[in-house]
Amino acid sequence: MLLSGEKAGLRRREPCVMMGINQEGVGAMLDYICWDWNGTLLDDVPLCVAVMDGMLQRRGLPSLGGEARYREIFTFPVQEYYRAAGFDFGREPFEKLALEYIEEYDRKALDCPLHAGAAEVLEALEAQGLRQLIVSASKQKALEEQVGHAGVRGFFEALLGLEDSFARSKSGLALQYFSAHAVDARRVLFIGDTLHDWEVAQEAGCACVLLAQGHQSRRRLEAAGVPVLESVAQVPAFLGAQKGGRA
């Protein structure tokens, strides 16, 4: 689906001359950057930890123990994360817990900032001719509201979110968009912050770079065997190095 942006129409661009890396490490021309949202562009890990700790505290359960442990146990499907956090689905069903979580998260999500340098990175990549979109496990309405509030909606050709609150999978979103808009997945780089983002990239057939600033630790991300950067601010330099190394 193609959603209207804040800018008065998105420019049609010629294919970008920047080089990327596909799953085999072979240079490929990039047309698109496909971004994850939560943890990749939006700095929401502190909020996620605070909301979950509040839920645990209300039930007399131990806290998560900080962001470092959170990054070690957060996973998809999120049911497994809730179990690791200490919830017993025999006492409360996952759906009830997930709705409680998302209601509190949504009330506070607009207070979350973008990661340092994220807006500047989006602007720089747009200036280089790359088309950008977001594929997220967030609900569609919440995604649109958060991206708009952050002031970066105009950088994206599309925002692709899920239709429920349970964040089961987003694997089909990229494939559907690529098919509907004749996007060559070999010319797409997916940038995310979880192993699920890597799985989505694999299924879609595009390259992947992961960021260690988000919802999973560098140790876990490195198991994917793709480049892991410390932060979104490093993306332009990384892409520039790929271009220079394959020119």
Model region roles, listed by residue range:
Residues R107-I134, Q140-E144, S171:
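Short, acidic loop-to-helix structural element flanking the phosphoryl-transfer center
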Residues L189-P227:
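Acidic, Mg2+-coordinating phosphoryl-transfer loop and its flanking beta/alpha structural elements
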Residues R69-Y70, R153-R168:
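A short, structured active-site edge motif that brings together acidic residues
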